[in-house]
Amino acid sequence: MKNIKAIIFDAYGTLFDVNSAAEKCKDKIGDKWEGFANYWRTTQLEYTWLRSLMNRHKDFWQVTEDSLDKSMKVSQIDPSMRNELLDLYKILSPFEEVPEVLKSLKEKNYKLSILSNGTPALLNELVESNKLNNLFHKLSWLYPNYPQSLAKNLYVFSLNF
């Protein structure tokens, strides 16, 4: 691995547990919290893919809100929980092993980065709320300046770490 200089991670579902927002509300949601969380994530991914295919880009936060609205309706979650769930999504918990793995890689002088379709504000809040910001060399995002599929793919290849 001596030729490797940078390691790039996705944020949502790779470093950060997308189910953790619903899990933190499991006392209010009840036993269906995990099914609700999985449905929310599946809907979020489906909305992202469909909008990309139809060339109708929405930023990641809008997709997250839209998918939450549908998921809450389908799962019959009290609508008054919407803002709480969205606030918790902004500060998702990292998977248990993530902080230690990132620290270990950083100590080996790898440049660590996140490449995500999350907005810069979302990524910064996510990383800072979990006290991981000192571990990353760069946070990069796909959509704000490159909404079309081809453009974002070319953008990824041009990143300089």
Model-derived regions: residue spans:
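Short, acidic loop-to-helix structural element flanking the phosphoryl-transfer center
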Residues: 57, 61-62, 80-114, 121-124, ...
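A metal-dependent, Asp-based hydrolase signature
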Residues: 48-83
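Short, well-structured alpha-helical segments
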Residues: 34-41, 79-87
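An amphipathic alpha-helix signature
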Residues: 22-23, 37, 41, 61-69, ...
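Short helix-capping segments at alpha-helix termini
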Residues: 29-33, 74-80, 107-108, 131-135
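Active-site neighborhood of HAD-like aspartate-dependent phosphohydrolases
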Residues: 1-45
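Substrate-recognition "cap/lid" segment bordering the active-site pocket of phosphatases
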Residues: 113-115, 119-161
